[in-house]
């Protein structure tokens, strides 16, 4: 796990975009894993800028969303299908048919979850997965207590997560109680994971998952077992890390040829 401490969101967005651009140069038909929430927005903004100004090409890319609310129609403005479309995919030249989402409106939820797992596998797996992290250490919607080997499934949202997400809705009562989410085992199958965290409110979660024990109480801690994880944090989110000086030193001392 590589921890990179940066001044702010702009620098985080640029560095994550560098990694994605390098991937697309090597592999134009790469498979991206897309997250929602505020954390990946600087990355999407920077990728859209590079597409518009420098022609960064997404025409052969496939993308898989991490999660989707259960019970929201696909066109609902806060469905993750619509959020990802507005915030990213409509701003680049990725084919709409190449952007995949769990089907939160399916009549047969278990079958929809298995179909999503099958689609990821058929695409060759995710090359690079973007993640944020919740204040309780959740990734995707794998809340505390989630199985570290879990696959795509339905999950109930805890009240803290519903409160965190209420800012995207009229009020907390409009936030659904259930989601479909890629499991921790599904996320761990991605070849490269980039997790982004900003702000002091994420500092404890960052410390817990980077430097704490691997345990279901902090779902993101499973990433300690992944062979290629990059953690991009601002100074505020890094403020509780005991080894912050070490992380700064190792990043500053990296060979110029070594990317993320």
Curated annotation (Swiss-Prot):
It comes from Arthrobacter sp. (strain FB24). The gene is nagB. It catalyses: alpha-D-glucosamine 6-phosphate + H2O = beta-D-fructose 6-phosphate + NH4(+). CDD domains: GlcN6P_deaminase. This is Glucosamine-6-phosphate deaminase. PROSITE patterns: GLC_GALNAC_ISOMERASE. PANTHER family: GLUCOSAMINE-6-PHOSPHATE ISOMERASE. The active site is at 67 (proton acceptor), 136 (for ring-opening step), 138 (proton acceptor), 143 (for ring-opening step). GO terms for cellular component: cytoplasm. SUPFAM superfamilies: NagB/RpiA/CoA transferase-like. GO terms for molecular function: glucosamine-6-phosphate deaminase activity; identical protein binding. It comes from the Bacteria. It is an enzyme of class 3 (hydrolase). Pathway: Amino-sugar metabolism; N-acetylneuraminate degradation; D-fructose 6-phosphate from N-acetylneuraminate: step 5/5. Belongs to the glucosamine/galactosamine-6-phosphate isomerase family. NagB subfamily.
């Amino acid at each position: 796990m590589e921890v990179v401490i940066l001044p702010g969101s702009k620098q985080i967005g640029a560095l994550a975009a560098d990694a994605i651009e390098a991937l697309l140069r090597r592999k134009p038909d790469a498979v991206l894993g897309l997250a929602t929430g505020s954390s990946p927005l600087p990355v999407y903004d920077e990728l859209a800028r590079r597409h518009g100004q420098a022609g960064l090409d997404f025409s052969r890319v496939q993308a898989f969303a991490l999660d989707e609310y259960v019970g929201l129609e696909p066109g609902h403005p806060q469905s993750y299908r619509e959020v990802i479309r507005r915030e990213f995919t409509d701003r680049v030249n990725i084919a709409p048919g190449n952007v995949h989402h769990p089907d939160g409106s399916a009549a047969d939820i278990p079958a929809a979850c298995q179909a999503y797992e099958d689609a990821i596998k058929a695409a060759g797996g995710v090359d690079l997965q973007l993640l944020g992290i919740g204040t309780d250490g959740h990734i995707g919607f794998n809340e505390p207590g989630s199985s570290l080997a879990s696959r795509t499934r339905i999950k109930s949202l805890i009240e803290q997560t519903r409160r965190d997400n209420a800012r995207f809705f009229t009020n907390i009562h409009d936030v659904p109680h259930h989601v479909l989410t890629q499991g921790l085992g599904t996320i761990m199958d991605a070849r490269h994971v980039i997790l982004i965290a900003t702000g002091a409110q994420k500092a404890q979660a960052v410390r817990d998952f980077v430097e704490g024990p691997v345990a279901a109480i902090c779902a993101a801690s499973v990433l300690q077992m992944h062979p290629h994880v990059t953690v991009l944090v601002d100074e505020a989110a890094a403020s509780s890390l005991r080894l912050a000086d070490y992380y700064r030193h190792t990043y500053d001392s990296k060979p110029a040829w070594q990317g993320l």
